[in-house]
């Protein structure tokens, strides 16, 4: 999935719906930086977390 993510896309973390919608900032070597509405910028390991496109 992470190979399809590009900066600017809107995503949601199904394990943490309370984070709200996030905008992908960058994708580098499996690490996805996302700026979520409710918690701010989070770096996610794309090998361990599956994000949903909004």
Label each PLM-derived region with a short phrase.
Residues 2-54:
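Basic/aromatic-rich interaction segments and small domains that mediate binding to polyanionic partners
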């Amino acid at each position: 999935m992470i190979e399809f993510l590009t900066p600017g896309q809107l995503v949601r973390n199904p394990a943490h719906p309370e984070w709200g919608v996030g905008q992908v900032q960058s994708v580098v070597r499996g690490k996805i930086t996302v700026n979520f509405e409710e918690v701010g910028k989070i770096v996610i390991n794309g090998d361990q977390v599956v994000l949903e496109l909004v």
